[in-house]
Amino acid sequence: MCMRTFLLRKPMRGKDDRSEILFSYIRLDERIPADHPLRVIRQLVDAALAELSRAFAKLYARDGRPSIPPERLLRALLLQAFYTVRSELQLMEQLNYNLLFRWFVGLSADDPVWDATVFCKNRDRLLNGDIARKFMISVLNLPEVRQLLSSEHFSVDGTLIEAWASMKSFVPKDGSKPPPGKGQDGSGGRNAERDFHGEKRKNDTHSSTTDPDARLFRKGAGKEAKLCHMGHLMMENRNGLIIDARLTEANGTAERTTALDMIEDNAKSGSTVGGDKNYDTADFVAGCRERGCTPHVSQNDTNRRSAIDARTTRHPGYRISTIKRKRIEEPFGWMKTVGGLRKTRHRGRGLVEWFFVLTATAYNLIRIPKILAATG
């Protein structure tokens, strides 16, 4: 090898040079893979948001300082549910450096990110117009989504959503102070430990100072009582998509009364409605029949007589409904783990319900592209 060839030869190892490029000539859209799941989801979201333009316009004054566009607010909140972002502060941090997040929300690479407090203030405006529910309906009414929904077979269920309040905040309504506690070092403190043993606490006499809408409730015998709200879902049985979501006070009859309200609003005469053993009561079965629906609830015949008999259970459709009904646990599981609703981050039933409905819509948006791809 001659000396000239040796000097001109370049080493295989690349150099770890850090150089800042002032300008970038690649659009954000080119950074996102063509088969990324968020591409289909964004198309669905944009189509649904376009139908809400008039509803958005009613929430804002004609004159004034421009605020965060409501479309971008909702897209950002959907990302918070999709990727389990714990707080709005963390969401703004991710929007600052995550190009995928910027692309989905509609920000360019150079657009400034909003302050977390400003974001929350603008978000709360959407609560006044019940935008979360309107957005869910808009998604379900999209032509490509409507064809996926069953109009005759449904399932209902409820779950507890733990409130953002500790048991120490559950104090007597009459203002009497609870017995003083002691801290770890034996002295009292602002957040001193409490011994609740032997103390009778009921919703009639006590309420939470942190979230007065929360109720002390346990889902079943032997379960832990906690401050919570009760969330309700109605699912269509063809593809397991959520068609209604509501949040109410946690009590022993809320599941059945709310289910009847959802049936009346969404199910036509001749429909079937599946439910677990908690719905096998005379009042719920009678309520379904009054609305022209057949109750396909699981029989609860332990030390009691079931509210339905062989006239219902002998049909093949009953067995199918009891199998399909179990799928309603899937959205509840996703909403609590991925969607972050195992313990809500918000206070007040109105705001908690708003996020409950939006998270249910986020679950639908995760499922719809997969169903569309499977059905062709």
Where do the protein language model's features map onto the residues?
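Basic, low-complexity intrinsically disordered segments
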Residues: 11-22, 26, 38-148, 163
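Short acidic (Asp/Glu) and glycine-rich catalytic loops that position anionic groups and cofactors
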Residues: 19-24, 52-56, 117-119, 208-210, ...
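Short helix-capping/linker segments at secondary-structure and domain boundaries
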Residues: 83-90, 239-241, 340-344, 363-376
